[in-house]
Amino acid sequence: MQQHLKYKIMTNIKHLAIIMDGNARWADQHNLTKSEGHKAGADKIRELLPEFLNLNIPYITLYTFSSENWQRSSTEVDFLIKLLSIYLKTELNNLHKNGVKIKVIGRLTLLSSSLQKQINNAIELTKNNNKITLCIAFSYGSRQEIVDACTKIITSGKKAVSDSDIQHALYDPEMPDVDLLIRPGGVYRISNFLLWQAAYAELYFSPKYWPDFNKYDIQEAINDYSKRKRTFGKR
């Protein structure tokens, strides 16, 4: 009964967003370097991919590198950028084989031209896949996204701006509103992540660090979500 209910619930979630938090603290806990913690966090994506595919949730967004993360040490920033490149290189074929469409959102012009090309190649290769969309938020900040959207609208010559105008000017206009936002790591905030898209999202926080997160934790979050009544401001 519980298994049947679980998969019934899953069909109601169109967009799952995850803040992959706690990699550095996990590393400290295990006497490892921050780089080893971030690598463990990236490896967790690979581990959870089968579960993401089984969930049958059309759109999943992972917060991997925020606009504020640029302020960290150059060593840590360089490693995180390198990690994205390595992930795309080693995982792209498997993602493509499993029908995953890749999207990457953020201020990508801050990245090297070679990494931008690698990102564009991954997007182009998988653009016709339709099993799930895996969106990687990298060099991403939601306030910056909204500012960039407004700048785009102003540049187009519009004098009045609607919700629809902003939606169509976002980094990914096709991104559905977030239904469930999960944040591991024991921190209770959303950290400038998908503020526009998560306006009515249900929030789920876990004390577990991201590298310790597993498919049962994902399922627990979804089951918790299923017990909530979403009113969207109505009664």
UniProtKB/Swiss-Prot annotation:
Its cofactor is Mg(2+). Keywords: Magnesium, Metal-binding, Transferase. Disulfide bonds: none annotated. PROSITE patterns: UPP_SYNTHASE (PS01066). Binds 2 magnesium ions per subunit. The active site is at 21, 69 (proton acceptor). Its EC number is 2.5.1.-. Signal peptide: none annotated. Substrate binds at residues 22-26, 34, 38, 66-68, 70, 72, 183, 189-191. The keyword Cytoplasm does not apply. Mg(2+) binds at residues 21, 202. GO terms for biological process: polyprenol biosynthetic process. It comes from the Bacteria. One of its GO terms (molecular function) is magnesium ion binding. Belongs to the UPP synthase family. PANTHER family: DEHYDRODOLICHYL DIPHOSPHATE SYNTHASE 2 (PTHR10291:SF0), DEHYDRODOLICHYL DIPHOSPHATE SYNTHASE FAMILY MEMBER (PTHR10291). Catalyzes the condensation of isopentenyl diphosphate (IPP) with allylic pyrophosphates generating different type of terpenoids. Homodimer. This is Isoprenyl transferase. It comes from Rickettsia conorii (strain ATCC VR-613 / Malish 7).
